[in-house]
Amino acid sequence: MKKLSYLLMIVAIMIPFVVCSAQSTSQKSVNSPVVEVLYFHVPQRCKTCVALENAAKEVVNTRFANDVKSGKVKFKEIDLNTKDGEKIGDKYEVAWSSLIIVRKDGKKEKTANLTDDGFRYAVNNKVKIQGLIADKINEFLK
C-alpha cells in the first residue's frame, strides 16, 4: 500500500512539469516565423522569368525540404492576371515578374525583393541566385 501511495505522489508531482513542457514546445512552434517565397508572373514569360522561377522552386524544394514539410517555408507562384494575384501584387507593389521573400511572424511582415538579382543571375549564374535566395530564407527563419 505504501508503494502505491509513493507512486501516486510521484505521478501527481510530475504532471505539472509534463504539461508545462508540452505548452512551451507548442508555443515555440506557434511563434516560429514562416517564410514565403513569392514568384509573381504574367502569362507570357521570357527565358529569364522561367529560369528565375525554376531556380527559386529548386532552392525551396531541395535545400529547405524539411522546412517545407513543417510549414516553415512555402513557395507560391502567383499569376498577376488573376483577381487574387493582382490583389497580392498590389500588396507587395508588384506589377510584373518578380521574386519577393516574405517573413511572417505573427502580424509582422518583413520583405526582401530579389527581382533585380534574379534577373541578373537566373540564366547565366543559377548558383549565385540560388545562394542569394537560400541566404535570405535562412536569415528570415531566425
Residue ranges and their predicted role:
Residues N31-T62:
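Local sequence-structure signature of Cys/Sec-based thiol-disulfide redox active-site neighborhoods
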Residues L8-F17:
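Bacterial N-terminal signal peptides
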